[in-house]
């Protein structure tokens, strides 16, 4: 039986792609092995959003050169955003790679894998591929939580971002197709559905002439089963009162708001081509806090954007102190080829970017400690994900997979529980990002 090794890189959206491509390989008769040396085919699904991502892609591709030298029959296939972004340079850089397939060509994946065509590189900037519930999928996440990608591409065109040029314009799946996928997943025992897209709040604009996110959520609400839904990647100015009001009464959609604000200074936001101002962020933050006693608000911010002054940075720090976020991720600005901001004046020194990043994360660490301290004594339903040393590791609805902290439960003194179980946990201790609890 043919064996395939998989190297997955990048974000949650790319993870869905990896799982679909693995589904295609499984249908072709491949089984999967963690040992690349025994593989007949190795698939590397890459990211290329920012410099660290495409550098990681390059390292992983080059890592396979030795495997190819030791096994001339090994088929190396590189997919993902790196292929789309660096298409013209691939053949010269990686002569040992057999096939490059960009995200827009995944509908041809099976035929390309099984053919012996002379053309090695297949990419399509005007991407039209979108997976459906009918496509095979092999989950690489635990089988009790999953990402569901509701749209592909992006129409926002932020000045620092390459995604619209790599993934194309917004393309939404139909509500009916998404509902069928969720029904299948729930029937298989999935307890946590994470809806993702480049911008979930623009879902449906291309199909229905307006955002259809609330309509989608209403349809998901009618699906029977023991599961909950978390929405990720929401655009600040598109978190509407209708969306908030629906989540407030929903029995399925949890009040977890992932809203990347990027910055709070109006001039910086304008240069980023973000279509909102600081007051809009305050309005959304305040509306959520007013409507939910227990909402989680997560955000992502960027430091070191061209022209960001010390005063602009201090404004950002002051903001997160005044309007604290339960979770905050951050990254430094990367001056990427092909972006509008590449040619902006006021490019900031790398050491200064890192200094600002460190200050920001140190500030958020203290904020997180204070917020976590308020959770002492509270009880939550927790899904057990894995074990680590003396602890069971799990998450409640308050912790998104991979990006947030976890809840740790000591094994000693706990009754017998298994991976995938949902248990009631009382919070006894806290850290900056993780919580420690005991079974109730």
UniProtKB/Swiss-Prot annotation:
Residues given in the record as [4Fe-4S] cluster 1 binding sites: 11, 47, 81
Catalytic activity as recorded in UniProt: L-aspartate(89)-[ribosomal protein uS12]-hydrogen + (sulfur carrier)-SH + AH2 + 2 S-adenosyl-L-methionine = 3-methylsulfanyl-L-aspartate(89)-[ribosomal protein uS12]-hydrogen + (sulfur carrier)-H + 5'-deoxyadenosine + L-methionine + A + S-adenosyl-L-homocysteine + 2 H(+)
SMART domains, per the entry: Elp3 (SM00729)
EC id: 2.8.4.4
Compartment(s): Cytoplasm
Major localization class: cytoplasm
Protein keywords: 4Fe-4S, Cytoplasm, Iron, Iron-sulfur, Metal-binding, S-adenosyl-L-methionine, Transferase
Cofactor, free-text remark: Binds 2 [4Fe-4S] clusters. One cluster is coordinated with 3 cysteines and an exchangeable S-adenosyl-L-methionine.
UniProt GO molecular function: 4 iron, 4 sulfur cluster binding; aspartic acid methylthiotransferase activity; metal ion binding; protein methylthiotransferase activity
Assigned GO CC terms: cytosol
Gene Ontology biological process terms in this record: tRNA modification
Needed co-factor(s): [4Fe-4S] cluster
InterPro entries hit by this protein: Elp3/MiaA/NifB-like_rSAM, Methylthiotransferase, Methylthiotransferase_CS, Methylthiotransferase_N, Methylthiotransferase_N_sf, NA-bd_OB-fold, Ribosomal_uS12_MeSTrfase_RimO, rSAM
Domain TRAM: 373-440
Positions of [4Fe-4S] cluster 2 binding: 154, 158, 161
SUPFAM superfamilies, per database record: Radical SAM enzymes (SSF102114)
Pfam families: Radical_SAM, TRAM_2, UPF0004
Segments forming domain MTTase N-terminal: 2-118
Domain Radical SAM core residue range list: 140-370
NCBIfam families reported for this sequence: 30S ribosomal protein S12 methylthiotransferase RimO (TIGR01125), MiaB/RimO family radical SAM methylthiotransferase (TIGR00089)
Role played: Catalyzes the methylthiolation of an aspartic acid residue of ribosomal protein uS12.
Family recorded in the similarity comment: Belongs to the methylthiotransferase family. RimO subfamily.
Protein name: Ribosomal protein uS12 methylthiotransferase RimO
């Amino acid at each position: 039986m043919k064996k395939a090794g998989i190297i997955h890189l990048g974000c949650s959206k790319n993870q869905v792609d990896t799982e679909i491509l693995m589904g295609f390989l499984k249908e072709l008769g491949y089984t999967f092995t963690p040992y690349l040396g025994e593989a007949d085919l190795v698939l590397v699904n890459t990211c290329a959003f920012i410099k660290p991502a495409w550098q990681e892609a390059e390292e992983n591709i080059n890592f396979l050169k030795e495997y190819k030298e030791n096994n001339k029959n090994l088929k190396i296939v590189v997919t993902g955003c790196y292929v789309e972004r660096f298409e013209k340079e691939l053949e010269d850089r990686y002569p040992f790679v057999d096939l490059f397939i960009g995200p827009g060509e995944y509908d041809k994946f099976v035929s390309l894998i099984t053919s012996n065509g002379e053309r090695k590189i297949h990419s399509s900037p005007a991407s039209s591929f979108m997976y459906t519930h009918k496509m095979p999928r092999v989950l690489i996440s635990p089988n009790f939580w999953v990402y569901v990608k509701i749209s592909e591409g992006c129409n926002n065109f932020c000045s620092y971002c390459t995604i619209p040029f790599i993934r194309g314009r917004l393309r939404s799946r139909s509500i009916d197709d998404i509902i069928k996928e969720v029904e299948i997943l729930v029937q298989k025992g999935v307890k946590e559905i994470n809806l993702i897209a480049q911008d979930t709040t623009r879902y449906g604009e291309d199909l229905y002439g307006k955002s259809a996110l609330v309509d989608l959520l209403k349809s998901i609400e009618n699906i029977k089963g023991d599961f909950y839904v978390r929405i990720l990647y929401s655009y600040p100015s598109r978190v509407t009162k209708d969306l908030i009001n629906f989540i407030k009464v929903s029995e399925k959609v949890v009040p977890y708001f992932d809203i990347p604000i990027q910055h709070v200074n109006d001039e910086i936001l304008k240069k980023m081509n973000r279509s909102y101002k600081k007051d809009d962020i305050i309005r959304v933050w305040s509306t959520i806090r007013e409507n939910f006693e227990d909402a989680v608000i997560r955000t992502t911010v960027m430091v070191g954007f061209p022209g960001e002054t010390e005063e602009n940075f201090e404004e950002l720090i002051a903001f997160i102190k005044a309007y604290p976020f339960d979770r905050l991720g951050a990254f430094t600005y990367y001056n990427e080829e092909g972006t509008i901001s590449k040619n902006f004046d006021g490019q900031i020194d790398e050491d200064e970017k890192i200094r600002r990043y460190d200050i920001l994360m140190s500030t958020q660490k203290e904020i997180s400690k204070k917020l976590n301290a308020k959770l002492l004594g509270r009880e939550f339903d927790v899904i057990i994900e894995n074990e680590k040393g003396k602890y069971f590791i799990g998450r409640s609805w308050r912790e998104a997979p991979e990006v947030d902290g976890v809840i740790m439960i000591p094994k000693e003194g706990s009754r017998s529980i298994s991976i995938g179980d949902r248990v009631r946990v009382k919070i006894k201790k806290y850290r900056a990002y993780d919580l420690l609890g005991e079974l109730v």
